[in-house]
Amino acid sequence: MEDKKIRVAITHGDTNGIGYEVILKAFDDPTMLELCTPIIYGSPKVAAYHRKALSMETQFSIIDKAEDARDGRLNLLTTFDEEVKVEFGVPSEESDAAARKAVARAKEDLQKGLYDVLVQAPMRSGANPAKEDKSLTMMVCDHVRVGLVTTHLPIKDVPQAVTVEKIVDKGRIFQASLKRDFRISNPRLAVLALNPQLGTEEEKVIAPAIEELEKQGVQAFGPYIADDFFGQQMYYNFDGVMAMFDDQGIVPFKTLANEYGVKLKAGISAICTTPDHGPAFDIAGKGVADEQSLRHAIYMAIDMLRHRMDYDAPLVNPLPKLYHEKREDGEKARFAVRPIQKKSTPEEGGEMEEA
């Protein structure tokens, strides 16, 4: 890996959105080609249409297979030959299909090991249906990393879906990703409460899940009321935040990320990132889209790959272990919060229960 540039596959996203605009803008900077070798999975005809409509001059080299990608060039791999009608700002079945074809071809090449990491330009969520699995949806920006315990559920169905087992599973995935993908040696997780006020779910589900995570070696704290947690900027004290459902994590995250957030799936072998915004149909074709979120998605994918290589290196030829690790109990005492316990804290004149 060190002898060659990292190959970054980038799917073109919704052809009626800002995908090509942010891709062309990002690689109009020559330093990007020094960082990696990009392979755009899309359509030369659609790319040329966008480039002309936006009066851009970014050059790309057309290839038919990923093996032909060359360093120092913006390689554009033809994923389909059909004509695609481009209507800026108009979501359509045709643009959805074009997005799906690019993703499908990229996934095929990923299985063959033809590139290193995958970045997806914005597309409608319906064009790439999500499914419940053993992964964790994460959103990352400079200030906070948020993991979602449940996704794509009506709010009325969330309480039943939030279980001790699910919180523990997602918490373990979160911890593993923070260690391997972000190189945080001893990550601390804040777990949000489900309700605006602590109630049944917090006492019977979330608190027991936190205790189980602790038993399994995960530093987990909470439950915290979401409004208080974000309003008081408590996220600065933690390496990750576990939200119980979409809006609980997405709404404050988007405010903090300011359109520069990145979304990824933790707990899977592949590295796949995407800007944390949609196709932005309202500004498509106007030349005003900001490419920084796509840049951040590319940077993060590359960093994750490097972090994994660094993390995995000692595991290839491990040295004999001559000592035993000791947990840092002091960290637990510092951040432990048990709002559902009835015992008073030292500040209230009582004794704090040991964490």
What is each of the regions a protein language model found here?
Residues 1-355:
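Anion-binding alpha/beta catalytic cores of soluble intermediary-metabolism enzymes, centered on
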